[in-house]
Amino acid sequence: MFDIGFSELVLLFVVGLIVLGPQRLPVAVRTVMGWVRTVRSLATNVQNELSQELKLKELQESIKKAEDLNISQLSPELSETVEELRQSAQKIKMNLEEKAAETNSSVEEQVQELKSAVQNSQGTATTEIEKNFDFPSGELSPAELAELAEEGEPMLEMGESDFSEDEQATASSNETIENIKEKV
């Protein structure tokens, strides 16, 4: 960089040793090396920026030249190829739009079919359950309650132990339960 030979470098070192002394010479060398690194990095940054600007300028000039030539001055074969590409792009776009519309309609149809199938299966399952299990409609009459109590239905055999944990169960409600048991 500075075109300094070995003998000149030794001479600078000896002068620096005499002027600065052995204690300050290493600090001075580090400082000078830091300056040299900074100058080198600045020079490379400026060089890179200039080369990028030149490339950008060349690209802009070539774009201007291409615009000046215009598409009308292209060869007839190239113009035909460009037109064919445009037509094929339009055909592909139309095909994609048609396929998208078909897909959307088929998806909507499938959703409607699934909804109706679910509704039908729910209705069928409810009627199947009602057929298989004879559910009494409405409320039970007192006679039917008594009949179920004699058969030993677990829901009708509730005693005081079932209500003992309830804090609001009072003595009158316990008596009412016992009265119902006696009647049934």
Swiss-Prot record:
NCBIfam families reported in the protein's UniProt record: tatB
An example Gene Ontology CC term for this record: TAT protein transport complex
Predominant localisation class: membrane
Protein's name in the database: Sec-independent protein translocase protein TatB
Family: Belongs to the TatB family.
Organism whose genome encodes this protein: Histophilus somni (strain 129Pt) (Haemophilus somnus)
UniProt KW keywords: Cell inner membrane, Cell membrane, Membrane, Protein transport, Translocation, Transmembrane, Transmembrane helix, Transport
One MF term in the entry's GO annotations: protein transmembrane transporter activity
Gene3D superfamilies: 1.20.5.3310
Transmembrane parts of this sequence: 1-21
GO biological process: protein transport by the Tat complex
